[in-house]
Amino acid sequence: MPESRRLVLLAGVFLLTLVNLTQSGPIALRTPEDWDNVPSFGDRLLKKRSPTVSERPGCKEGATIPPNRVNTTKRLIDLRIQMDLYNVSAYIVTSDNAHQGEEVAPHDHRREFICGLSGSSGTAVITKDAAAVWTDGRYFLQAENELDCNWILMKDGEAGVPNITAWLREVLKTDEKVAADPTLIGTTTWQRYDKDLAPIKFEPLLTNLIDVIWTTGRPPVNTEPGFILHLNYSGESWQDKVDRLRAELPKQGADALVITALDEVAWLLNIRGSDVPNHPVLLAYMYVSSTQLVLFAETSKISSPEMQTHLTGVTQRPYDRFVAELPDLAQSASMVLIPSQFVYTGGASYAVYNAIPETKRLLKPSPVLMMKAKKNTVEAEGMMNAHLKDAVALCDVISLMVEEIPKGVRWDELKVSAELLKYRAQQEVNKGASFNTIAGYGPNGAIIHYSASEETNAVIGTTSLFLLDSGGQYFDGTTDVTRTLHFGTPTAAQIKAYTLVLMGHLDLARLVFPKTTRDARVDVLARAPLFDQGLDYLHGTGHGIGHFGSIHESPTRVALGSSVENTFFENYFFSDEPGYYKDLDLARLVFPKTTRDARVDVLARAPLFDQGLDYLHGTGHGIGHFGSIHESPTRVALGSSVENTFFENYFFSDEPGYYKTGDFGIRIESILRVIPTTFSTEFPDRFFRFQAVTLVPFERKLIDVTMLSDGQIDYVNDYYVLVRQKVGAEMTKQNRTRAYNWLISQTEPLMLPEPVNKGVSIANKQVWVGIWTQLFISMFVVFKFY
């Protein structure tokens, strides 16, 4: 073959190889404008192709179809007919209602209807010839089961998975149109989509296309009236709360505020409702200024004489008039604060944002969010009391399971949920569950937010682990607790996995830390024991929790994800330089490649914090190669401008876990309260610590005590003393003998096994200690002067 032909052939093979390595193969250049938007060669080179349906294990030839998989073919056909009528090339369906909360009423489960995924988090995107769902790690396994093979599963955050706008740019032409309902997408998200999709058009469509096609089997809207949360539970009148809010607005640069989050309306006015299952809220909006206080709610929800008396001084308007009346309300304001997305709070919808005159818009987190998170004394003590009652109910059910399951009495996942509802209802001022119980036996426990159904309901046996995550709503507080149990003889692997999770749980729970510590920075403490074994879990470690409110309450979120700090990369060099002690913890850390640098700082400081000490500099910095001594971007330090600091009487969860797909799941979750602590050091009032709120024993048979540190053992034993004092006394008061006996058996002190006696007497041991001590001193002298 001539040399020139050989070179041409090699060049062709090389180009084909590059095409196959790029993200989406050859680029179709259909219009002159397409040339302006071609991704650069560098952007496309060596990028993984986007996921496809054929890559899903459950969609391969011969795969078993899960019993809970939903057939969406007819629904997609109907939706695409509507898309054609409105000249829409892609339609985005979120999980939200008009208030952008995490949980929505069944009537608003539009995303679940179109795709079949029943988890609380996810976004569906439908084009004329494809459909994809983005969801987070809590729902990867669940989505694989529930999504039929019309759907591409986009595992958000995983390598090679594009975000929504990147995928749409990949599959659409620049002259096509993407649409969504502007009342169901938060402003921050809408603006990001609009910017990232350009030049593809992203337009609001007020006709909701899912509503058009969802004509049968749609759950009705709740009609139950709202009710008052009286002062003995709320601890502060709504009038005083409004006064505090009005005083805060000028500090935020505004003289008016839109409130769209349901839990913020409920908290501010001391009212509750039943419009969202497990969340005591009613559908409502508010507008607040120095002279205006307007509540938009269904008249039937607030029409009782008692409610009308309670709301004296509040202007009341129909719920569905909110967006239409906003322009008139805002006329007298110079600047209107519109809530932005913040942690678990979705912020105001784009429709609400758009209704405020452009020159008067101030988009930032709602000040009500921060006010609500700081529990007053009555709320804080109510939370403690609610968790005490809840512990009695939960222990009662667990003790019954421990008694009956080994005897062969049938218990399945749905029965556990039903029994928990029944036993919690026996406690004072209980108002049902705070979320749908997660009761997963064996492989079901590995589905992080598993929800048992008639199709998946498993009988609980004695060979695998049982994960139980549940909570209750009470007038005096909201609870959330997870314990992992075993009703037989666990394997060594199960014990090791459980103990690793427990170690992380304990290390976070017993932390002492400066008051300026950012919440996300303590996450690594809970994960470190798992990291050391090459393990991790795909969810946050902790979340804020409301007072007779939301199970996930902003602003507290203990999780590794952040948009500010930098992740570590291979061959980064940085310093590890805490003061006051020998810093082994950080140096021996094993951690995921996505870990943010600042998140490991607390490992180096924790031993000092425990003694009321600290050092006033960063723990580590990047270092150059024959260059800068302080090299960007690596900086290991507690300071940050994004996450939130803890405040006294914040309540949040501590819930590390481990999930072995197809085998079992482990999670241990307790609620902690932030309280001050003092030391006789140069930093006397610098520190917070956590107070245990959840008072439920750990599973003794799953704990390998030899893996625990002395500090961890001491913490568990002190915790068990508290559990006996508080919960044991309440059980005695309520005559719950079975639960009490189980509680006592589970809270015996943890003790290390006695060492095996090899026949060496105490006297001989003392002799040998003396010999080794003298030998060490002699060696030290020799080496020192050698």
Positions of PLM-derived features:
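Conserved mixed alpha/beta core segments that line enzyme active sites in large multi-domain catalysts
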Residues: A98-I114, S121, I228-A284, I438, ...
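Hydrophobic or amphipathic alpha-helical targeting/insertion segments
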Residues: D129-V133, N150, N163-V221
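Extended boundary segments
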Residues: N68-R75, L79-D84, S399-V429, H505-Y537, ...
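C-terminal GPI-anchoring signal of eukaryotic secretory precursors
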Residues: E754-Q774
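Charged, cofactor-coupling segments
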Residues: G25-K60, L117-S121, I126-I152, L172, ...
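Intrinsically disordered, low-complexity, positively charged segments
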Residues: T73-E112
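Cleavable N-terminal signal peptides of Sec/SRP-targeted secreted and luminal proteins
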Residues: R5-S24, G770-V782
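Flexible inter-domain linker/hinge segments
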Residues: A63-T64, V212-A254, T260, K374, ...
